[in-house]
Amino acid sequence: MIRGWTIFTLCKPSALVGSSHFNKQFNWAKSQLQFATKVPQQPYAKTESILPTLQEPDTKPAIDRHTVQLLERLSLVDLETNDALETLEDSIGFASRILTIGTEGVEPLYTVLERERLSLREDVVNDGDLQTDVLRNAAVTEEEYFVAPPGNIPLELQENSRPIAH
């Protein structure tokens, strides 16, 4: 299968298009695909554009110091820099603009790919002893467990941290 795809990366497309060798290689590579692609092959027509709604003038939300400290403690992310605060304000502003989009009469999706036929793999029964295989995915293990970074330790306030300019 890899050899069939290598031809696409090593040759110029103009040299391949229309040649019988290209068609044979493409058909061979296509026949080697085991699962159907999840990417839609045709774009879906939109009923209305949401871009004008999303391009309204920005109104940056006012975020007080207490809220920033709470978010830092919950997310373990340092938001003391002006760049981080600006990104946070932009994200909140974008989310508030999304809330204004009219969704009346729009059926909810179960998945973004619900118009595509998704092939399932074969259901293979095994003995279930996959612990060593699963633990190989972990960066750090202790005995027979995954080791995750602690999520409940709050960030310490640094002496040299700059206050946020409002």
UniProtKB/Swiss-Prot annotation:
GO molecular function terms noted in the UniProt entry: ATP binding; glutaminyl-tRNA synthase (glutamine-hydrolyzing) activity
- Which keywords does the record carry? ATP-binding, Ligase, Mitochondrion, Nucleotide-binding, Protein biosynthesis, Transit peptide
Cellular component aspect of the GO annotation: glutamyl-tRNA(Gln) amidotransferase complex; mitochondrion
What's the protein here called?
Glutamyl-tRNA(Gln) amidotransferase subunit C, mitochondrial
Q: Which SUPFAM superfamilies match?
A: Glu-tRNAGln amidotransferase C subunit (SSF141000)
Superkingdom of source = Eukaryota
Q: Which organism is it from?
A: Anopheles darlingi (Mosquito)
- According to its UniProt record, the EC number is 6.3.5.-
